[in-house]
Design a protein with these regions (language model features):
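Interdomain helical connector at the RecA1-RecA2 junction of SF1/SF2 helicase-like NTPases
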Residues: 1-87
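Active-site-adjacent beta-strand anchor residues
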Residues: 12, 73, 94-96, 158
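Amphipathic alpha-helical transducer elements in NTP-driven molecular machines
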Residues: 13-16, 20, 77, 124, ...
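Switch/connector loops and helix/strand junctions flanking conserved nucleotide-binding motifs
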Residues: 17-18, 148-150, 164-169, 180, ...
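Conserved helicase ATPase core of P-loop NTP-dependent helicases/translocases
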Residues: 91-96, 100-148, 166-169
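Short beta-strand/turn micro-motifs composed of small residues
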Residues: 96, 115, 160, 188-190
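Conserved SF2 helicase motif VI
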Residues: 127, 155, 163-185
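Conserved segment of the helicase C-terminal RecA-like domain
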Residues: 174-207
Length: 212
């Protein structure tokens, strides 16, 4: 059995204001250029239009800023610390959608990080230490989505992620390992009233996210 816990996080007032300003700048540019995001092709069009002018580049920068803020806001990091303390006697894997967020978490909480930049030898050493219980918590940016056996993990924390159903079912698979009296937990941290809200809705529509 496993438990899914959706955690909605309110941004701090100053970060909320900064997010809204940046997001509105990006959306205004998209509207002025008649770009409606319905398919991946629309995003490609947005990127092409952004590259043609200073205003476009500023709009893209604003989008990146807002997205990064939602992924690793102060409020989200505080919430993450609370969860880590709650499960301090259990092994946990933290999932992020990008390397920058993974490294921010690693530096903030002094946790080992595995990304595609991590050397193979270092990755193997960390995973071995994790399996042997010498490392209690690990942060990864997509690298562990598939093909890695970590049988003792009972806690997963999705700090940020894409809307890919396949990706998140794989994340469930990383923690849902059979064991006596074991109940796995998957936390999903979502910055409320940001682009993360819509991403969360998409991925949780999958049957794997409906089970309790």
């Amino acid at each position: 059995p496993y438990e899914l816990i959706h955690v909605a996080i309110q941004l701090d007032e100053d970060e909320r204001e900064a997010y809204d300003l940046a997001y509105e700048r990006y959306r205004t540019f998209a509207r002025e250029n008649r770009i409606v995001f319905r398919t991946p092709a629309d995003w490609s069009k947005f990127m092409q239009v952004c590259a043609r002018s200073r205003e476009g580049r500023e709009a893209f920068t604003a989008w990146r800023f807002a997205r990064g803020l939602a992924k690793a806001s102060r409020a989200k990091l505080r919430t993450l610390w609370t969860i880590l303390c709650r499960h301090r006697h259990q092994q946990a894997i933290l999932f992020t959608d990008d390397n920058a967020t993974a490294y921010t978490i690693g530096e903030t909480f002094f946790l080992p990080v595995i990304t595609h930049h991590t050397k193979i030898s270092e990755r193997k050493a960390l995973l071995t230490a994790f399996r042997e219980g010498k490392v209690n918590c690990m942060v990864t940016s997509r690298v562990l989505n598939e093909g890695v056996d970590v049988p003792e993990v009972a806690v997963g924390i999705v700090v940020s992620g894409s809307g890919s159903v396949r990706e998140h079912v794989q994340r469930l698979g990383r923690i849902l390992r059979p064991g006596p009296d074991k109940r796995a937990v998957l936390y999903e941290l979502v910055s409320e009233d940001t682009g993360e809200t819509f991403t969360s809705v998409r991925r949780r529509q999958h049957a794997a996210y409906q089970r309790e």
